[in-house]
Curated annotation (Swiss-Prot):
Name under which the protein is recorded: Tryptophan synthase beta chain
Residues annotated with N6-(pyridoxal phosphate)lysine modification: 90
Signal sequence extent: none
Similarity annotation: Belongs to the TrpB family.
Organismal lineage: Bacteria, Pseudomonadati, Bacteroidota, Bacteroidia, Bacteroidales
A GO term from the CC aspect: cytoplasm
Gene: trpB
PROSITE patterns noted in UniProt: TRP_SYNTHASE_BETA
Keyword Ribosomal protein: no
Keywords attached to this entry: Amino-acid biosynthesis, Aromatic amino acid biosynthesis, Lyase, Pyridoxal phosphate, Tryptophan biosynthesis
The UniProt record lists the keyword Transferase: no
Protein species of origin: Parabacteroides distasonis (strain ATCC 8503 / DSM 20701 / CIP 104284 / JCM 5825 / NCTC 11152)
CDD domains recorded: Trp-synth_B
Amino acid sequence: MKTYQVDKNGYYGEFGGAYVPEILHQCVENLQNTYLQVLESDSFKEKFDQLLRDYVGRPSPLYLAKRLSEKYGCKIYLKREDLNHTGAHKINNTIGQILLARRMGKSRIIAETGAGQHGVATATVCALMNMECIVYMGKTDVERQHANVQKMEMLGATVVPVTSGNMTLKDATNEAIRDWCCHPSDTYYIIGSTVGPHPYPDMVARLQSVISEEIKKQLLEKEGRDHPDYLIACVGGGSNAAGTIYHFVDDERVKIVLAEAGGKGIHSGMSAATIQLGKEGIIHGARTLVMQNEDGQIEEPYSVSAGLDYPGIGPIHANLSVKHRAQILAVDDDEALEAAFELTRLEGIIPALESAHALGALAKVNFKPEEVVVLTVSGRGDKDMDTYINYKLS
């Protein structure tokens, strides 16, 4: 049977793999040899499920958005990842990875963060497990997501502002990898998305797959069937999208729509529409689609959303795109901002700017009245209030 899941060598079609400096070979190989044994063990599953239930507050609701549904002429359910502890889907992954890190005997945790949500989720589980935590964050993002920086510091993490390059997510990831190279024996790197060398894209997708597992059960209760007609999610690196589609990716009855950041317009030179603009290349240890110039130098991405301005894309999504399994839509800054205000006014839910890109895709698809659409609200909008207020003032 045709599958879009990872193969035994860590590839999704031609994308994926592990391209790492020699100093990290041993680290990455240990992780490759260990992660499935741990993730599939009964003791891990029991602890992971217990923490998701009692600490994160799962299952997250599947909410029928009636007024939004009326507007777009179909049945729209919102998967409410914004209601998780820490306000986004990121905690699903950090809880799983910190349990794995402890099993591997690591004592020091590092992470990269863009919008700060993964940083907060990592600092949170480090506080929970009493482990040292260092978070790398681009200086640009430190300034635009200051509330999350304060949360991380309150949780006991050291936040390191990164001043190289564009001073955003890509640069923070580079610094985290440098740190890992210097401390391979005692340090575990919790990557926040379905990016990086194998096994990270698969591991993060598996840990986030609790989202699609719940969607199946919840739809069965609400609609009498376990699959929607459409799944819609935003993609930066792609972890909330990977979790949303995980149990449906091989079910051709389900259409997949991925919304990437169009920035100021896909041809403006100020965008993060990696799938549509990228060419095959290697970034942060994985072969995937990368925004690059003629000489193969990585181009600086741009998005109003700090969580989506990444110049690569998870290899799972690169593969879904080239195989035409997913429809890729670029949603620009203004479309996302308008969609955020629309959801707020229609349903009383203020979404994260990242999630607003998924909402912005609704206007670009023609739905039929009987179709069931599940859209993942990956996070809540608290961290983006300054951007929202400034947008309305302008």
